[in-house]
Amino acid sequence: MSSSAPKYTTFQGSQNFRLRIVLATLSGKPIKIEKIRSGDLNPGLKDYEVSFLRLIESVTNGSVIEISYTGTTVIYRPGIIVGGASTHICPSSKPVGYFVEPMLYLAPFSKKKFSILFKGITASHNDAGIEAIKWGLMPVMEKFGVRECALHTLKRGSPPLGGGEVHLVVDSLIAQPITMHEIDRPIISSITGVAYSTRVSPSLVNRMIDGAKKVLKNLQCEVNITADVWRGENSGKSPGWGITLVAQSKQKGWSYFAEDIGDAGSIPEELGEKVACQLLEEISKSAAVGRNQLPLAIVYMVIGKEDIGRLRINKEQIDERFIILLRDIKKIFNTEVFLKPVDEADNEDMIATIKGIGFTNTSKKIA
């Protein structure tokens, strides 16, 4: 073998697929992902993972992606993040949030501003919805200096047929994230949210709101949930409804969120109650950031300045997914996250300490 052949950082399995591609793109290091569902009846990449790789190709220049005949091995040699304007058609197997979320890791470090129109389903049970990204993830970006970032809902599209359109615009282009120091728990001052529907009776929206308020009424803070009823050509191709709730700290600017959508035959009041209970659980099992915001915060801290950053996290957040993330960061960036208790009296929270790698936005330099 030639000595000039690239050395690949190798991963196995389909878990953390998007983030491994994102980390490789940020680091510029080639990776190899093998044994992707090799033991399944339908082995290899799913259609949405192939679609995600196409999206990565469209926002980078010089990336090389090789997929084996069986689809169980992917070799990725990252190029430069260039961004720009594009349209991405999402498969019906995943909502637009599955594709928007990883772009939040890349867009601020691009050569050009990101302007991507995503078409497809706008909500699902398992992936981030539009409001969760707008009110939950983008505020985390703002904490790291990414302030000009927006997600516009042009059309809602409920499963299974979708028909939604979402426009991601990221105008902030920064050299590197600012250093994070957040060692306190934010105090929740208000709960906001939106209950939405497409091609169904507007009464379902009010019933979801009533169900959520029934759970949240005893909280010592303001609760404001708005109704968002979509009709006509902007309401997609399928009937559907859902609710997103966000707990906010006005003093600190942090937020937690919970969301879900209704299924055929489900009761709107029960969905509202369920999501409200999920929000309360998220608050109780979080510290500075929620469970679904933690990966974004950790990655931004890793690629920050060569300074020590600190973030308060809850022990409940140290799960298998978090451990896999830390191992992947160690493999690609060769840096570690150190965890220590807040103090002897506090057995719930830990302080995550990270020294930034001094990442530099090479795309911006080339620009």
Swiss-Prot record:
Gene Ontology CC terms: 90S preribosome; nucleolus; nucleoplasm; small-subunit processome
Main location: nucleus
GO MF, one example: enzyme activator activity
CDD domains registered for this protein in UniProt: RNA_Cyclase_Class_I
Location of N-acetylserine modifications: 2
Source organism superkingdom: Eukaryota
Compartments it resides in: Nucleus, Nucleolus
Alphabetical list of InterPro entries matching this protein: RNA3'-term_phos_cycl_insert (IPR013791), RNA3'_phos_cyclase_dom (IPR023797), RNA3'_phos_cyclase_dom_sf (IPR037136), RNA3'_term_phos_cyc (IPR000228), RNA3'_term_phos_cyc_type_2 (IPR016443), RNA3'_term_phos_cycl-like_CS (IPR020719), RNA3'P_cycl/enolpyr_Trfase_a/b (IPR013792), RPTC_insert (IPR036553)
Any GO BP: endonucleolytic cleavage to generate mature 5'-end of SSU-rRNA from (SSU-rRNA, 5.8S rRNA, LSU-rRNA)
Keyword terms: Acetylation, Nucleus, Ribosome biogenesis
Pfam families per UniProt: RTC, RTC_insert
UniProt subunit comment: Interacts directly with BMS1 and the U3 snoRNA to form a stable subcomplex. Component of the 90S small subunit processome also known as 90S pre-ribosome that consists of the 35S pre-rRNA, early-associating ribosomal proteins most of which are part of the small ribosomal subunit, the U3 snoRNA and associated proteins.
Similarity comment: family membership: Belongs to the RNA 3'-terminal cyclase family. Type 2 subfamily.
Note: Present with 10000 molecules/cell in log phase SD medium.
Function text: Does not have cyclase activity. Plays a role in 40S-ribosomal-subunit biogenesis in the early pre-rRNA processing steps at sites A0, A1 and A2 that are required for proper maturation of the 18S RNA. RCL1 activates BMS1 by promoting GDP/GTP exchange.
Protein name, entry field: rRNA processing protein RCL1
